[in-house]
């Protein structure tokens, strides 16, 4: 189980609030934690991740994970990722890791939201495209991997636990 959280909007999140949120997330992933931030015109985006290493234990699979202008923060497991790798190999994609995270991100780059039709497993994730300034979120069909979100003061905030949203937004619910 990993932890994911993030924010998308005009609000600048203090580094101390990011660190505090990452500390809250450690119970969901003690192996590694980090964050991605980007400013696009007047918008700010933050993707936070706390990792529990399961499939690929190598640090090259740490998250947030980047390919070109795409960044992902992913919680879950894609059960059929080995079969999906074959699709990528047929398209001459050279993978750099053994992780289902990289497979998922490449599938999204190629197929967009239609990649969800290919997935078997449990997941929640956020993918940000820093060229188009678009954020895409999804969770598995049964909600096995939680994904909470809120739109507060023109700020879209999400997380795998409500307390992560509270920590990033500094609001009480």
Where would I find each of the regions flagged by the language model?
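Cysteine-centered catalytic environments shared across enzyme families
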Residues: 1-173
């Amino acid at each position: 189980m990993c932890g994911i959280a993030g924010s998308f909007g005009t609000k600048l999140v203090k580094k101390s609030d990011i660190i505090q949120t990452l500390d809250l997330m450690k119970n969901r992933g003690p192996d590694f934690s980090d964050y991605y931030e980007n400013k696009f015109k007047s918008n700010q985006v933050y993707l936070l991740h706390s990792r529990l290493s399961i499939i690929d234990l190598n640090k090259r699979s740490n998250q947030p994970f980047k390919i070109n202008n795409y960044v992902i923060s992913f919680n879950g497991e894609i059960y059929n990722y080995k079969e999906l790798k074959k699709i990528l190999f047929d398209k001459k994609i050279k993978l750099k890791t053994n992780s289902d995270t990289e497979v998922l991100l490449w599938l999204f780059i190629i197929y967009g939201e239609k990649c969800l039709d290919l997935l078997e497993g449990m997941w929640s994730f956020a993918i940000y495209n820093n060229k188009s300034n678009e954020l895409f979120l999804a969770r598995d069909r049964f909600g096995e991997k939680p994904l909470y979100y809120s739109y507060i003061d023109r700020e879209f905030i999400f997380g795998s636990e409500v307390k992560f949203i509270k920590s990033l937004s500094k609001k009480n619910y």
